């Protein structure tokens, strides 16, 4: 007689079947929904990043004197803009060029300036900016004129979306000072409507 208490090793206990349960299905649904949401966020982030353009104005090798001697690094001046009225200038330092440029881009996006543009992709009024020993004068121009500027000033104006403008550099020729002076000039621009409101007059009086 065989012992009825002995069970065959091939027998599976109840509840250990390989069939998926309702809880497993719910977990898979949650996971798929999370992946979809994450995918949409990634696409939105990529679209935002694709709007911005980056141009390196200058890369220099700099040194810092420390206790053990001189520490060499790279400094990158980067202009960031979307050609739709937003532009920024950033500076980044790192031990390699790629790291310096990456930091410069991040710094530029932290110091963005909104530029009021006219229908002709120009600026509404004349403006002057100064940084250190550099001074920049920018004035509106007629359609078809183009960007009459040079160096880092031209880069700032182009990435801001300005297509018709005249610019004159005075004083220092340093790329960083000129770029920052151009940023100061752009930050002081106001639309005709805002100017009329500040002065307490009508738009007709502004144009007259």
Curated annotation (Swiss-Prot):
Give a single Pfam family match: Ribosomal_S5_C
Can you list the disulfide-bonded cysteine pairs?
none
Q: Which residues form the S5 DRBM domain?
A: 52-115
Q: Which Gene3D superfamilies match?
A: 3.30.160.20, 3.30.230.10
Extract the PANTHER family matched here: MITOCHONDRIAL RIBOSOMAL PROTEIN S5
Query: Which HAMAP family does the entry link to?
Result: Ribosomal_uS5_B
Q: What does this protein do?
A: With S4 and S12 plays an important role in translational accuracy.
Q: What is this protein called?
A: Small ribosomal subunit protein uS5
Q: Which organism is it from?
A: Prochlorococcus marinus (strain NATL1A)
């Amino acid at each position: 007689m065989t012992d009825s208490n002995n069970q065959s090793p091939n027998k599976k206990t109840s509840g250990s079947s390989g069939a998926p349960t309702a809880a497993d299905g719910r977990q898979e649904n949650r996971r798929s929904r999370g992946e979809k949401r994450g995918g949409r966020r990634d696409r939105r982030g990529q679209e935002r990043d694709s709007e911005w353009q980056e141009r390196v104005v200058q890369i220099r090798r700099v040194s810092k004197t420390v206790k053990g001697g001189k520490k060499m690094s790279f400094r990158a001046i980067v202009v960031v803009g979307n050609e739709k009225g937003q532009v920024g200038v950033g500076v980044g330092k790192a031990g390699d060029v790629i790291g310096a440029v990456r930091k410069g881009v991040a710094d530029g996006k932290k110091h963005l300036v909104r530029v009021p543009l006219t229908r002709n992709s120009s600026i509404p009024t004349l403006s002057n900016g100064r940084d250190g020993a550099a001074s920049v004068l920018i004035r509106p121009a007629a359609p078809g004129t183009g960007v009459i500027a040079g160096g880092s000033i031209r880069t700032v104006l182009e990435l801001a979306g300005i297509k018709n403008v005249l610019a004159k550099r005075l004083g220092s020729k340093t790329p960083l000072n000129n770029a920052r002076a151009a940023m100061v000039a752009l930050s002081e621009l106001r639309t005709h409507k805002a100017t009329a409101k500040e002065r307490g007059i009508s738009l007709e009086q502004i144009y007259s």
